[in-house]
Amino acid sequence: MEKYIVTGMSCAACQTRVEKAVSKLPGVDNCAVSLLTNTMGVDGSASSAEIIKAVEDAGYGAKLQVADEEDAQSAIQSGVNESILEDHETPVLKKRLISSLGFLLVLMYVSMGHMMWGFPLPGFMDGNHVAMGIVQMLLSGIIMVINQKFFVSGFKSLIHGAPNMDTLVALGSGASFAWSSYVLLAMTGAQLAGDTAQVEAYMHEFYFESAAMIVTLITVGKMLEARSKGKTTDALKGIMKLAPKTAILFENGEEKEVPIEQVKIGDIFVVKPGASIPVDGFVEEGESSVDESALTGESIPVDKTAGDQVSAATVNQAGYIKCRATRVGKDTTLSKIISMVSDAAATKAPIAKIADKVSGVFVPAVIAISLVTMAIWLLVGRELGFALARGIAVLVISCPCALGLATPVSIMVGNGVGARNGILFKTAVSLEETGKAQYVVLDKTGTITEGNPKVKDIVVADGFDEERLIKIAGSLEKYSEHPLAKAVTDYVQGKGVDLSSSELTGFAAVAGNGLKGKLGEIELAGGNRDFIEKYADINEDFANRIDQLSKEGKTALYFCENGRLAGVIAVADPIKEESAQAIKELDNMGIEVVMLTGDNQLVAESIAKQAGIKNVIAGVKPDGKEEVISNLKKRGKVVMVGDGINDAPALTRADMGIAIGAGTDIAIDAADVVLMNSKLSDVSAAIRLSRATLRNIHENLFWAFIYNVIGIPLAAGAWIHLTGWTMNPMFGALAMSLSSFCVVSNALRLNLFDVHSASKDKKIKFNNTNDFIEEESEMKKKMEIEGMMCGHCEATVKKALEEVDGVKSADVNHKKGVAVVKLSKEVSDDILKKAVEDKEYVVKSVESKLF
């Protein structure tokens, strides 16, 4: 996505105009304009020159966000150009406002002070109404020149056929000035004719103060809005300021301070107590505790020793450490966070489309309503001055800005709150949609559990000893990247077993099943029970012993040598301390929690019981996880939470994917939301924040719509006959100036929202059905069978299988040569195979499968 800075936008109508102009270009796939940050993100093959020309043809200005050498270097280091977030608008508006108020006070003194309160006037004006009118015209004209931006932008947009908020202000103020100037000319004629009564009558037809007050009050509102908008990006600006500007490199035995841009991958840098870590890396020497709250929101310092990872912008609290740089510039964790938050602000939430559609026709509709209002009052016999006042009031009270800001300000603040708490939403869509979750599907390892499994039991088969078993296991597992493999290799190395000579040939990893390879002439295999049963026999007594370990939540890894079972290594991964509470919070929100794991049913049920999860789908291979998510999506909104490579397809397939921050880069890339902490409680926090943000957007949209629905008829004088109410255009301008300020202020309330407080959680009722989950939770095996020729064969095989202890049912299809067996407990492949082959059919294969 290329990013551009857009200038000249003043309201939602401008935003819509720019989006339409760029979206029409050939090669533009997507265009999102942010009125909040005055930026535009464009996807596609269109050139930057074409895009900039399209924006300029629409009446606005544009330039690439990284446009010069200095900005480019800054962007490389931080991942985003910080200058675009600086508040350049408020100082300019402040100067305009001070100048306008100075002249406005004099104007109000002249126009109202003498008449209402008897304030003295200069001699040349006392009793000279024409002189008073000329002074008012000059003062009003000066104020309008000071605020000429409204007129330049407004009439320019009108000429381009895309009127905006500035057009409404310019028409309202300009009409007041033009009418008053006409009255002044008429008054001059009356005075020359000696018609004193007519001169007195004309004196009450002046609207010079309204013309000046309108632009001044709108400037007040614009300044309040600009200051509030600046606060919405405080979180992002705060993160940017965390980036250290220098680093201390250790070269040739000496310390040397250099600009952060000069640090390269592989450099050794030192971090002293109290200093910020400059780039990502790992500790080579020393020990310390590091405050990572800037990235994760977690206030408790983390102990670091040799080999541990450190991240840029975290603070070294205690020891002196030497580190080696692994990621610098835009690749650091900090830069990625900044980029994610910035990119999210540049995207558009689906709910914003409502406001966009209205904004596209809002200003032309208001101008039409204003003209109709004037025409109606003239037709019913009211004087031109009264009709004009009603038409001007309609123009200046209408506010498309409130509509345009309703969604993006809430998205920006919500993203900032998330970033401060270690919850990163990649897009506005993910921030809006996460809170709509009906099902939260959790991977087991590293998500519910700590992801740091340890060997707990060694069960040796007959004819083998423990040393031989763990050498077989270590020889295989050292080639695997699975978390369980690391647990085994750590255990083997801890026992002092030398694996340097254990070089395998023909090594292969079968996803979701196991490993195999040859050590010289010896064939080795390791994995789950179904996998090992293809290579070795497992007697029933041994299997029962292992089932008991599985019921305790331990994962059994079987190993065999040359077709003989060598034994089992049982590995346990304890659940995270906060997992049970996190799942309880999700349940209290009305969300169905599902555990989805490749582990066997007994282990999965044990972990689920500890965590308080009612729905378990076990024995699922990596490709099967994606299939489960697809089926579950037919029943409601699905959020998938995972941390591993195997979870990436499921994360992508889900309505929303949430990656645990300590997980793999692949999982993080596939996800829509990233949790910088590895705490499961942050899942409920993300959903809670999403719901709060969406609620805030609804409040903003309601205010923006209801304000215009009530305000425009009031300004038009629709209620005069019922209530006698009329609205002075000045009060209309005041209301307009405050409307956007109210919307932005409401969005800023999100900064006070506690994402971890479950006290106000509401249990949203969904029509969730658990039939699918219960069906998928059953253990199933698929058997390919040869020799079945007819319905009688089907019935024979079905009866044989259903007589096996542990088989709930068997669905047999002789045409496909397949039997699907549903189990109530673990049943070995050999037992099922024997039951069928005793009936003189041939079993080609047996496998656990998800359907």
Give residue ranges: language-model regions:
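Flexible metal-binding regulatory segments at protein termini and peripheral loops
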Residues: M1-G133, K229, E254-E257, S339-T347, ...
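Conserved ATP-binding TGD loop and adjacent catalytic N/P-domain core of P-type ATPases
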Residues: T347, A437, L519-E521, G553-T555, ...
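Conserved catalytic phosphorylation-site environment of P-type ATPases
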Residues: L295, I354, A389, A402-L476, ...
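Conserved cytosolic catalytic loops of P-type ATPases
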Residues: P26-D43, S48, E205-F206, K237-D331, ...
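ATP-driven catalytic headpiece of P-type ATPases
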Residues: K95, T314, Q438-E481, A511-V594, ...
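Transmembrane helix-loop-helix hairpins at the membrane interface
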Residues: V92-T246, K357, I458, G724-P729, ...
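Juxtamembrane coupling segments of multi-pass membrane pumps/enzymes
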Residues: T196-A197, A212-P273, K304, I354, ...
